[in-house]
Swiss-Prot record:
Disulfide partners: none
Keyword Ribosomal protein: yes
Coiled coil: none
UniProt keyword annotations, A-Z: Chloroplast, Plastid, Ribonucleoprotein, Ribosomal protein
Compartments (UniProt record): Plastid, Chloroplast
Protein name: Large ribosomal subunit protein uL2cz/uL2cy
Subunit structure: Part of the 50S ribosomal subunit.
């Protein structure tokens, strides 16, 4: 991804650093409208997810996470911007006439060919079971349950690594640093997700963030005591606690929130480090 800097004619262009976005040229049979209900509210209209609301209307692009078009070569026709995710998507034309969207692998260009199935070449963009991959392969769009489609390592720049295979399981190191076991029969896509430099992007102004459906975030230390545990005091005061807390008084910033005795605890060999 190329970061584009504007001429500093206004404060917003001085602080902004955006990517050179690919034009969107979506197909009508692969997109459909979605009802973004609530804007962070539940069925009673109460805010359950803060800092959400507004934003530009979006059309959902149907992404092929299963990659079940087996043993048929497909050609990358377009690389497009998707408003529903940080990663780019690319339109694939298969030899049997099928057309689908997939996540854009980093380094893939228009005209490249991909294929999915067992014992296919270890090439960027190809999808195959973990049992057919050599150790050390960089992968993304990884299945957790066979046939359900990729669920892990799908964000922009995400990449996991196959580090071991033993018995019926394969050991993966995920982007978060977590090391876990997954069935060797599950499929994954070779390579890294594209648009890896998305974290270098700076919106530059509040209005650009509003377009994304993100509302302003107010610090608890500048609120009143009735609104936040960190609030109150004369002037600039500390939070008045040993440890930071959420607006509802629960421990924040470091407290482990994973549910205890979860079924997948036995599959996690090392907890995530991020």
């Amino acid at each position: 991804m190329a970061i584009h800097l504007y001429k500093t004619s206004t404060p917003s262009t001085r602080n902004g650093a955006v990517d050179s976005q690919v034009k969107s040229n979506t197909r009508n049979n692969l997109i459909y409208g979605q009802h973004r209900c609530g804007k962070g509210r539940n069925s009673r209209g109460i805010i359950t997810a803060r800092h959400r609301g507004g934003g530009h209307k979006r059309l959902y692009r149907k992404i092929d996470f299963r990659r079940n078009e087996k043993y048929i070569y497909g050609r990358i026709v377009t690389i497009e911007y998707d408003p529903n995710r940080n990663a780019y998507i690319c339109l694939i034309h298969y030899g049997d006439g099928e057309k689908r969207y997939i996540l854009h692998p980093r380094g893939a260009i228009i005209g490249d060919t991909i294929i999915s199935g067992t014992e296919v070449p270890i090439k960027m963009g190809n999808a195959l079971p973990l049992t057919d991959m050599p150790l050390g392969t960089a992968i993304h769009n990884i299945e957790i349950t066979l046939g359900r489609g990729g669920q892990l390592a799908r964000a922009a720049g995400a990449v996991a690594k196959l580090i071991a295979k033993e018995g019926k399981s394969a050991t993966l190191k995920l982007p978060s640093g977590e090391v876990r076991l997954i069935s060797k029969n599950c499929s994954a896509t070779v390579g890294q997700v594209g648009n890896a430099g998305v974290n270098q992007k700076s919106l530059g102004r509040a209005g650009s963030k509003c377009w994304l459906g993100k509302r302003p975030v107010v610090r608890g230390v500048v609120m009143n005591p009735v609104d936040h545990p960190h609030g109150g005091g004369e002037g600039r005061a500390p939070i008045g606690r040993k440890k930071p807390a959420t607006p509802w008084g629960y421990p924040a910033l470091g407290r482990r929130s994973r549910k205890r005795n979860k079924y997948s605890d036995n599959l996690i060999l090392r907890r995530r480090s991020k």
